């Protein structure tokens, strides 16, 4: 989307939430009810609905799967969430993982659910009945994933240290397990599994701090007497994290992962890996001949025993504070061609974080344009907010050929600082002109409408408010004054705040969230789900609570397409 399309830059805001009253209780050794452990552990949107259809998601607790439909409403007070099906697991299993598939004959939606019993139960959601059960793991299952390339192929990650690849295709009905990823891959319970978009690569991670990448063979379109067993991953490393890894995912050919106690989500790449290259076979995987090596990779061959080329590279770290000792906390990336990739994560202190990865490139472009204009026009530069609806050509015509015009993304909001007692008047506008402001005070006051209110001091959750609609605390807030030592005219506080959120030049720096939203009450986020078209984001967690966030709302009183939101 072009930078001028303000709606595409909008980040989600909380629309509503609900708590599902579960009847699951934990029985102590003496048979007494010791505590209520009701908790949603997983949420997944049905990915096979036709474009424009109301999205459907499943929130999975230990004994239930709650199937909900989300619809646009014209009233901000109307509940957009409707429960359309409720599935109860009456067995002994405490479930924690789910994924979607569909019936290969009827195309009816299927929901796969798994937990500590180690079986994958497949339910026909339309009928609310058990469709079939996949048996084979020797321990509990902690994660499920569906291949983006084939809705009938799913993967399960288990405490038995293996990943099983299952097929729901009719030809594999008698032997649904088509592949086992095990052997020397992992040594302890697995927590996360993810497919590449092409369906031929799988990531796995867990308690042993190891992240593995496996290349899958092509599976025959006929009955298989025994599953294919792959003993070695094509990439393996315990160097990315220093604690158990509870979430891993592909972002294109890049990888996102997080670990307990680290309070970060790491973006990194495997050197030499490209999904465009031929798929390596099982015999191509490197074997652990030297157990002292913490990383081995098929994609970075060692030329000589003395050479130690980098096998992976850290690219960025997204700051997720206040996770504490909690684990089993999952992020989710919304990544659809032609739309902004948005990363979402909820911590253990009732906050949800959002990062729009398209903003990094726009920020770099803006800072480069600003620097170039400063040099080319000897400091005579005017910064125009794109949210004002003025094009670059129009701005250049107004200011003339002797002034450099730089278009600033509307979501780059100058930081506001608390007004000192007795301090005067209004702050500066957004002109960067080497220490003096060519714009008049009326323009400054108009620009301040894009600044944050006092309740939004993270300056990543900005709304384009009028003066009459500001938070009460905003009366004591003014824009940070221009710094004469700054080459860009913005205050040091503003430039630092922008760098903290949008500067990717330091791969070990902590990138603050572009938007951080808090809710009342204690809440530990467990999983995030995105609707297929990106307009809804659902976060589930303890207390069987689901938070429903929305973008591009059409409801009266909610507004739409706020540039800085």
From Swiss-Prot:
Keywords: Chromatin regulator, Nucleus, Repeat, Repressor, Transcription, Transcription regulation, WD repeat. WD repeats lie at residues 89-133, 136-176, 185-224, 240-278, 519-559. It is found in: Nucleus. The keyword Nucleus applies. Pfam families: PRC2_EED_ins (PF22038), WD40 (PF00400). SMART domains: WD40. Disulfide bonds: none annotated. GO terms for biological process: chromatin organization. It comes from the Eukaryota. Residues 451-468 have a biased composition (Polar residues). One of its GO terms (cellular component) is nucleus. PROSITE patterns: WD_REPEATS_2, WD_REPEATS_REGION. Residues 429-450 have a biased composition (Low complexity). Residues 417-488 are annotated as: Disordered. Component of the of the Polycomb Repressive Complex 2 (PRC2), a histone H3 lysine methyltransferase responsible for generating mono-, di-, and tri-methylation on Lys27 (H3K27me1, H3K27me2 and H3K27me3). The tri-methylated form is known to be critical in gene repression, and its proper placement is essential in defining repression patterns during development. EED is not a catalytic subunit but is required for the complex regulation of histone H3 lysine methylation by EZH2. Belongs to the WD repeat ESC family. Component of the polycomb repressive complex 2 (PRC2) that consists of four core subunits icluding EZH2, EED, SUZ12, and RBBP4, among which EZH2 is the catalytic subunit and which minimally requires EED and SUZ12 for catalysis. This is Polycomb protein EED. It comes from Chaetomium thermophilum (strain DSM 1495 / CBS 144.50 / IMI 039719) (Thermochaetoides thermophila). The lineage of its organism: Eukaryota, Fungi, Dikarya, Ascomycota, Pezizomycotina.
């Amino acid at each position: 989307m072009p930078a001028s399309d303000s709606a595409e830059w909008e980040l989600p805001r909380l629309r509503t939430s609900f708590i599902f009253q579960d009847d699951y209780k934990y029985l102590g050794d003496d048979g007494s009810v010791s505590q209520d452990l009701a908790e949603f552990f997983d949420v997944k949107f049905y990915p096979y609905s036709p474009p424009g259809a109301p999205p459907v998601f499943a929130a999975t607790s230990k004994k239930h799967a709650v199937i909900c439909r989300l619809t646009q409403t014209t009233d901000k007070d109307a509940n957009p969430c409707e429960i359309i099906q409720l599935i109860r697991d009456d067995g002994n299993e405490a479930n924690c993982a789910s994924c979607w598939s569909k019936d290969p004959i009827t195309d009816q939606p299927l929901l796969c659910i798994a937990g500590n019993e180690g079986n994958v139960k497949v339910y026909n959601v339309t009928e609310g009945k058990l469709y079939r059960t996949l048996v084979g793991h020797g321990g509990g299952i902690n994660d499920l994933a569906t291949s983006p390339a084939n809705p009938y192929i799913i993967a399960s990650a288990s405490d038995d240290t293996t990943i099983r690849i299952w097929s729901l295709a009719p030809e594999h009905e008698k032997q649904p397990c088509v592949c086992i990823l095990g052997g020397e891959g992992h040594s302890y319970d697995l927590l996360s599994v993810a497919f590449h978009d092409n369906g031929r690569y799988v990531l796995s991670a867990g308690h042993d701090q190891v992240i593995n990448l496996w290349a899958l063979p092509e599976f025959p379109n006929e009955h298989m007497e025994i599953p294919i067993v792959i003993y070695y991953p094509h990439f393996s490393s315990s160097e990315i994290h220093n604690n158990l890894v509870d979430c891993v995912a592909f972002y294109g050919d890049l990888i996102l992962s997080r670990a307990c106690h680290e309070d970060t989500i790491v973006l990194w790449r495997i050197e030499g890996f490209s999904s465009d290259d031929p798929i390596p076979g099982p015999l191509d995987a490197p074997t652990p001949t030297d157990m002292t090596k913490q990383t081995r990779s098929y994609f970075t061959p060692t030329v000589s025993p003395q050479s130690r080329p980098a096998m992976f590279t850290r690219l960025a770290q997204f700051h997720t504070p206040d996770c504490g000792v909690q684990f089993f906390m999952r992020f989710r990336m919304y990544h659809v061609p032609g739309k902004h990739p948005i990363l979402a994560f909820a911590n253990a202190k009732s906050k949800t974080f959002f990062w729009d990865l398209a903003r990094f490139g726009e920020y770099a472009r803006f800072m480069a344009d600003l620097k170039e204009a400063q040099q080319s026009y000897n400091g005579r530069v005017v910064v125009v907010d794109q949210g004002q609806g003025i094009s670059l050509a129009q701005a250049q015509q107004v200011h003339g050929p002797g002034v450099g015009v730089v278009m600033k993304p509307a979501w780059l909001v100058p930081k506001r600082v608390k007004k000192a007692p007795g301090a005067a008047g209004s702050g500066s506008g957004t002109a960067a002109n080497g220490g003096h402001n060519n714009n008049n005070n009326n323009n400054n006051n108009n620009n301040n409408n894009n600044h944050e209110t006092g309740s939004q001091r993270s300056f990543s959750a900005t709304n384009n408010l009028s003066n009459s609609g500001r938070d009460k605390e905003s009366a004591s807030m003014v824009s940070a004054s221009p710094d004469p030592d700054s080459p860009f005219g913005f205050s040091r506080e503003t430039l630092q705040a922008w760098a903290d959120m949008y500067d990717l030049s330091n791969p070990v720096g902590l990138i603050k969230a572009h938007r951080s939203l808090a809710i009342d009450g204690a809440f530990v986020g467990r999983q995030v789900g995105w609707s297929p078209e990106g307009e809804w984001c659902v976060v589930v967690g303890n207390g069987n609570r689901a938070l429903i966030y929305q973008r591009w709302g059409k409801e009266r009183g909610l507004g739409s397409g706020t540039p800085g939101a």
